[in-house]
């Protein structure tokens, strides 16, 4: 199974890349973590937020492989504990499909794109900056894998 994070935004601080790479390297090949950065629509284009989200949605669609299971990150999504995320990861793995986590830009994700997803996931009730979302998601996916495989990383 491959875990793909399709995230709008291309110029992240160095600490984000360092943290992302660290968690991605920790995961084994049968649960590989891959980042697909999506070019954001310029906020100076004169387009409405809905038009910008639609343009970003088209770029996200293009970046995803066919047949991937889509999970949108959204503030109104399911709030899972880490253990519940681990159980969900196990179900996704048993289903035999790659999983893509979609992270929107400053205005969020296009409504039609969210509707095409098989689930909505909320990382926190707090508003998080986009660089932090990448790191937090990578860490939680690694932690979920650690729980699933009885790796000692997670101590609860």
UniProtKB/Swiss-Prot annotation:
Assembly description:
Homodimer.
Origin organism is Bordetella pertussis (strain Tohama I / ATCC BAA-589 / NCTC 13251)
**NCBIfam families xrefs:** PRK00103.1-4 (NF000986)
What catalytic activity does the UniProt entry give for this protein?
Answer: pseudouridine(1915) in 23S rRNA + S-adenosyl-L-methionine = N(3)-methylpseudouridine(1915) in 23S rRNA + S-adenosyl-L-homocysteine + H(+)
Give me the disulphide-bonded residues.
none
Family under the similarity heading: Belongs to the RNA methyltransferase RlmH family.
What InterPro entries would the database entry show? Answer: Alpha/beta_knot_MTases (IPR029028), RlmH-like (IPR003742), tRNA_m1G_MTases_N (IPR029026)
Which E.C. number(s) belong to this protein?
2.1.1.177
SUPFAM superfamilies from the UniProt entry: alpha/beta knot
* UniProt keyword annotations, A-Z: Cytoplasm, Methyltransferase, rRNA processing, S-adenosyl-L-methionine, Transferase
Protein name, as recorded: Ribosomal RNA large subunit methyltransferase H
> Where does the record place it?
Cytoplasm
Q: Which domain of life is it from?
A: Bacteria
Q: Which residues bind S-adenosyl-L-methionine?
A: 73, 104, 123-128
Gene Ontology CC, one term: cytoplasm
Q: Which GO terms describe its molecular function?
A: rRNA (pseudouridine-N3-)-methyltransferase activity
Q: Report the function annotation for this chain.
A: Specifically methylates the pseudouridine at position 1915 (m3Psi1915) in 23S rRNA.
């Amino acid at each position: 199974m491959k875990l793909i994070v399709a995230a709008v935004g291309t110029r992240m601080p160095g600490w984000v890349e360092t943290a992302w790479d660290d968690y991605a390297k920790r995961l084994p090949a049968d649960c590989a973590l891959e980042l697909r950065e999506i070019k954001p629509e310029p906020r100076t284009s004169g387009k409405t937020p809905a038009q910008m989200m639609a343009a970003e949605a088209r770029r996200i669609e293009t970046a995803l492989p066919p047949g991937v299971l889509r999970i949108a990150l959204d503030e109104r999504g399911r709030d899972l504990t880490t253990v519940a995320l681990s159980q969900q990861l196990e179900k996704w793995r048993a289903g035999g499909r790659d999983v893509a986590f979609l992270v929107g830009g400053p205005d969020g994700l296009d409504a039609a794109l969210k509707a095409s997803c098989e689930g909505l996931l909320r990382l926190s009730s707090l508003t998080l900056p986009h660089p932090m979302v990448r790191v937090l998601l990578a860490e939680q996916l690694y932690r979920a894998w650690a729980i699933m495989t009885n790796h000692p990383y997670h101590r609860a």
